[in-house]
Amino acid sequence: MGRVIRAQRKGAGSVFKAHVKHRKGAAKLRHIDFAERHGYIKGIVKDIIHDPGRGTPLAKVVFRDPYRFKKRTELFIAAEGIHTGQFVFCGKKAQLNIGNVLPVGVMPEGTIICCLEEKPGDRGKLARASGNYATVISHNPETKKSRVKLPSGAKKVISSTNRAVVGVVAGGGRIDKPILKAGRAYHKYKVKRNCWPRVRGVAMNPVEHPFGGGNHQHIGKPSTIRRDVPAGRKVGLIAARRTGRLRGTKTVQEKEN
């Protein structure tokens, strides 16, 4: 019998978990409160920091607690163009400026946003990667819903009370620079997770992978595989509808609903 293959080992356990030792913390919007629902609250950007394992810079924003005599520090996804010492306003009546946090329903159509809430109060789930942004498409005041275009190009209908940061996520163009050497890839994935270097299946022995073995490196069987095979055999092109090159030209018309 063969060994437990890599795809099976990627489950419970510490081997493939993210390396979170030096992370700075979870980057989220403020908890929704009375000040944000009915007016605005002012904070100041104290620092812009790097978070290991994340390509996006983070902004340390300090707010006065509206209910206690103390200050609270929040970690925001930094929007491109913000700077230390800048005032950040969060709330329904805040101005539409870069870095401010507003409900989607009060933004004009065509506004560029990031760190968008998927559900009201979840503190930002969509368009958070470096250089990403979503676009406000339309509003429906009757149903209190808004339509946004996500970085993937998909369009999503969300509640108009969902909050978002105005602007584009900082750190855009990060992946344009080539890695060039293995040492940089080593350090990149050292702070992310144990997924590098990745050995090819055909380079393994037969006990370690279904594609392993042979006098030369070849798969030796169809690389397509059905959906319901056991986990130790499920490698290659899983339940592929088609394989090979996409030949010819095909025009796709985007439907506007």
UniProtKB/Swiss-Prot annotation:
GO terms for cellular component: cytosolic large ribosomal subunit. Residues 207-226 are annotated as: Disordered. One of its GO terms (molecular function) is rRNA binding. Gene3D superfamilies: 2.30.30.30, Nucleic acid-binding proteins, Ribosomal protein L2, domain 3. One of its GO terms (biological process) is cytoplasmic translation. It holds the Pfam family Ribosomal_L2. Coiled coil: none annotated. Keywords: Cytoplasm, Ribonucleoprotein, Ribosomal protein, RNA-binding, rRNA-binding. It is found in: Cytoplasm. Its main location: cytoplasm. Component of the large ribosomal subunit. The ribosome is a large ribonucleoprotein complex responsible for the synthesis of proteins in the cell. NCBIfam families: PRK09612.1. Belongs to the universal ribosomal protein uL2 family. Component of the large ribosomal subunit. This is Large ribosomal subunit protein uL2. It comes from Ictalurus punctatus. The lineage of its organism: Eukaryota, Metazoa, Chordata, Craniata, Vertebrata.
